């Protein structure tokens, strides 16, 4: 049984949606990914060569690293993955 439903930020895709209170991405869950976890993320992303572009494109490794640092800043971490919790059953 699914207990929680989250969405995540997709660089250069999420930005094109209409940003209002009913739609849009407003993160409220942050996961610390500093260090080895972040490196695994970037290594995994590099496997998707057709999806990545050169900086300053939002889907470049460099831009994604900057986004991760910006997400971390919001919650006092060096690097974070941000999610939006839509529903949780407790």
What do these predicted regions represent?
Residues 1-90:
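Metal-dependent de-N-acetylase/amidase catalytic core
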């Amino acid at each position: 049984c699914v207990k929680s439903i989250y969405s995540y930020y997709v660089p250069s895709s999420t930005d094109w949606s209409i940003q209002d209170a009913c739609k849009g991405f407003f993160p409220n869950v942050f996961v610390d990914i500093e260090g080895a976890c972040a490196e695994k993320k970037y290594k995994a992303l590099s496997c998707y060569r057709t999806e990545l572009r050169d900086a300053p494109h939002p889907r470049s490794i460099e831009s994604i690293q900057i986004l991760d640092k910006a997400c971390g800043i919001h919650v006092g971490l060096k690097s974070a993955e941000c999610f939006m919790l839509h529903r949780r059953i407790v």
